[in-house]
A protein has these predicted regions:
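Aromatic-lined carbohydrate-binding/catalytic grooves of carbohydrate-active enzymes
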Residues: 68-126, 133-194, 198-201, 205-207, ...
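N-terminal export signals
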Residues: 5-24
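C-terminal beta-strand-rich structural cap/linker in extracellular carbohydrate-active enzymes
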Residues: 429-450
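C-terminal segment of N-terminal export signals and the immediately downstream linker at the start
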Residues: 18-39
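Structural recognition of the beta-strand scaffold that forms the well-ordered cores
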Residues: 40-45, 75-80, 137-140, 206-211, ...
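Catalytic cores of secreted or luminal carbohydrate-active enzymes
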Residues: 324-367
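Carbohydrate-binding surface patches
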Residues: 320, 326-329, 334-336, 370-410
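Glycan-recognition surfaces
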Residues: 167-171, 184-185, 191, 233-338
């Protein structure tokens, strides 16, 4: 059984309700947080390389990212799961992995895949290359301590404790065999996490995607807190991204105090039912979103995917709906396709500056009522009087649908309408905005009062 099947089996919890009510209070922080003041944008290797990416493939993608995507704000380059596994084979995991580790049970890049990591260099040489391109560098971590470190009972750096002293062998990931959980009540447990993030800091890591964190949330919360403390102790700012979902809505206050972004669903792939389900999740999480705290609808499975075997299955309308929803809901924008095969249509989808401005520079983003399978979101531009309106036809019927939005809901009477995707002014309307949308299609308008 592969990761996706195991995730689905482990997370058959159902969607949360469609209510967006929350008693959440803003997290106490400065008005402009140092980490992730806007939704993070970047690239991640999972959708295109699974567990198998090599140094050569990584650098090739980073160079293309710097040239084609960085000018539009995509600046976090992340190597996903099992970079420490020399025999990693794809979307399935080896049942008895042999991870590359140091003498203290800390994971190291597999030298057969990342040759620059030898002689203790770790990811520092790749980080240096990525930084030289003007990008930030991120890596993936699994929750816990390697099972092999526990089997060998390796000593924890800087103390008298060993791996077996802190391992919780009852706490295991249901879909990956690499790690045991860490019992944070044990002496030496925080020392281990501190040592891991100190190693990442020595490599100049900027972003950590930490997996197997959100389910079961309450059981794993001590390790979420441990990772947060370890980053603070490392002395290096690192964005902490928690995965997979879905994170329980009831844990929203806790998660946003300890991470900059967190997944609201299982792995998201290019299938319409999954995209349709994200509407409810993003609606539910809207009240917890604020600068430096971002509910994450997952990566953008666009372009060439799954180890080069296929291209994105979404229709052009569905791809635009994906980008429109992620933008108006201010989800992080993390491209997942192999950039070596970046086609003009996908590049255009990712680099529309007017659409990206909605994601990066808007406020008061909120969902409106669901009426006959038409989803509606509105927002304000960060500066000026412009409002944003996104309308979505999520119906699975074949017929197109007439959609309408009464301007009175925004306290407006007459507006100039601009189609942000077409980058074209549509003229002035009074009273309401109307359009015809095909099934699974969407629109994104800028509305300027007149």
């Amino acid at each position: 059984m592969n990761r996706r099947e195991l995730l689905a089996a482990a997370g058959a919890l159902g969607l949360l309700s469609q209510s967006t009510e929350s008693n959440a209070a803003p997290v106490a922080n400065s008005s402009t947080p140092a980490l992730a003041p806007t939704p993070p944008m970047g690239w991640n290797s999972w959708n295109s390389f699974a567990t198998t990416i090599t140094e050569e493939q990584a650098i090739a993608n980073a160079e293309i990212m710097a040239r084609e995507l960085k000018p539009f704000g995509y600046d976090i380059f992340t190597i996903d799961i099992q970079w420490y596994e020399g025999a990693a084979k794809g979307y399935d995991y080896n049942t008895k992995p042999i991870p590359t580790m140091d003498e203290h049970g800390r994971l190291l890049p597999a030298p057969n895949r990342f040759p620059s990591s030898v002689k203790g260099a770790g990811f520092k040489p790749i980080a240096d290359k990525v930084h030289a391109l003007g990008l930030k560098f991120g890596v993936h971590l699994m929750r816990g301590i390697p099972r092999l470190a526990v089997e060998r009972n390796l000593p924890i750096l800087g103390g008298k404790w060993k791996a077996r002293d802190i391992a919780n062998t009852e706490s295991v990931c249901p879909w990956n065999p690499d790690m045991y959980g860490v019992d944070m009540s044990k002496p030496g447990a925080q020392d281990y996490y501190n040592s891991v993030f100190a190693l990442l800091a020595s490599w100049d890591i900027d972003f950590v995607k930490m997996d197997d964190m959100s389910r079961p949330y309450d059981a794993n919360a001590p390790e979420i807190e441990a990772a947060h403390r370890a980053i603070q102790a490392s002395g290096r700012p690192m964005i902490l991204s928690l995965s997979p979902g879905e994170t329980p809505l009831a844990s929203g206050e806790h998660v946003r105090r300890h991470a900059q972004m967190w997944r609201i669903s299982d792995d998201f792939w290019d299938e319409w039912p999954q995209l349709k389900a994200q509407f409810t999740r993003l609606e539910n999480w809207s009240m917890f979103r604020q600068p430096g705290r971002w509910p994450d609808a997952d990566m953008l499975p666009l372009g060439r995917l799954q180890m080069g075997k296929r291209d994105c299955r979404f229709t052009p309308d569905e791809q635009r709906t994906l980008m429109t929803l992620w933008s108006i809901a201010r989800s992080p924008l993390i491209m997942g396709g192999d950039l070596r095969h970046l086609d003009p249509a996908t590049l255009a989808l990712l680099t529309n500056r007017e659409v990206l401005a909605v994601n990066q520079a808007s406020r008061d983003n909120k969902p409106a009522a669901l009426i006959e399978e038409v989803r509606t979101w509105t927002a304000r531009a960060e500066q000026g009087e412009t409002r944003y309106l996104a309308l979505f036809n999520v119906s699975d019927k074949k017929e197109s649908k007439q959609v309408h939005f009464d301007l009175s809901r925004l306290g407006l009477k007459s507006v100039k309408v601009r189609d942000l995707w077409a980058r074209r002014d549509l003229g002035t309307v009074r009273g309401r905005v109307s359009a015809t949308l095909a099934p699974h299609a969407s629109l994104l308008y800028g509305l300027t009062p007149v």
